[in-house]
Amino acid sequence: MTHEIRAIFDRIAPVYDQLNDWLSLGQHRIWKEMAIKWSNPQPGETFLDLCCGSGDITLGLARRVGATGHVYGVDFSANLLAMAQERSQRKYPYQSTITWVEADVLDLPFDSNQFAGATMGYGLRNVKDIPHSLQELYRVLKPNAKAAILDFHRPENAQLRSFQQWYLDNVVVPIATQLGVKEEYAYISPSLDRFPMGKEQVELAYEVGFASATHYPIANGMMGVLVVSK
């Protein structure tokens, strides 16, 4: 399954940002900013951005930790990491403060208690073992560190859930089809059906040891941010 998902993200890399704009009605950058804010980066700190994709959140974190801090952007798609690196060279002057790492979030190549905070944008839904992924995140965070995990969410409201499904079927998949990546985006709906709801995410976070966990529904419950503290 991991190899299949890695292959999907390698294939969609060229149209990833364009599709994210359509997927989110142009709002994903606002939601990513919310996740950054909740993770509370401070100047000089070392931060981690998991499933960094094309680097939006990584760059946002880098701007906040500044020239004296450091951010590690981690993804298992080599194509997306190459895109992220290219974008960062155009948009961010302090290249030495960002390290791009090709790695699996289920087996992070970092020491325990290494990071002052972390983010994950649209990644938790795609890992094959969510509790283990949260355990790895817990391991690499310093005591009292915060992390914010942004992802799609099935709304509890039946009408909003119907709208979300209609939008995925009638807007997202046709656009993906036009861009030649229909199969790659058709998986979003089944992945959402498997994904734990907000309160279940909170329970999983407590089970792996986090001291506090809160799930914030955003975009009428069609997105959510899980905020945890070690």
Which ranges hold each PLM region?
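Conserved alpha-helix/loop element of class I SAM-dependent methyltransferases that forms part
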Residues: 25-45, 60
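A short acidic, Gly/Pro-enriched loop at the edge of an enzyme's catalytic core
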Residues: 45, 106-118
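Class I SAM-dependent methyltransferase SAM/SAH-binding core
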Residues: 46-107
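A short SAM/SAH-binding and catalytic strip from SAM-dependent methyltransferases
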Residues: 116-130
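Core SAM-dependent methyltransferase catalytic element
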Residues: 202, 209-230
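N-terminal, positively charged/glycine-rich alpha-helical extensions of SAM-dependent methyltransferases
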Residues: 1-17, 167-168
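C-terminal alpha-helical "lid/dimerization" subdomain adjacent to the S-adenosyl-L-methionine
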Residues: 3-4, 150-206, 214
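A short glycine-rich, Lys/Arg-flanked "PGG" loop and its adjoining helix->strand segment in the class I
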Residues: 131-146
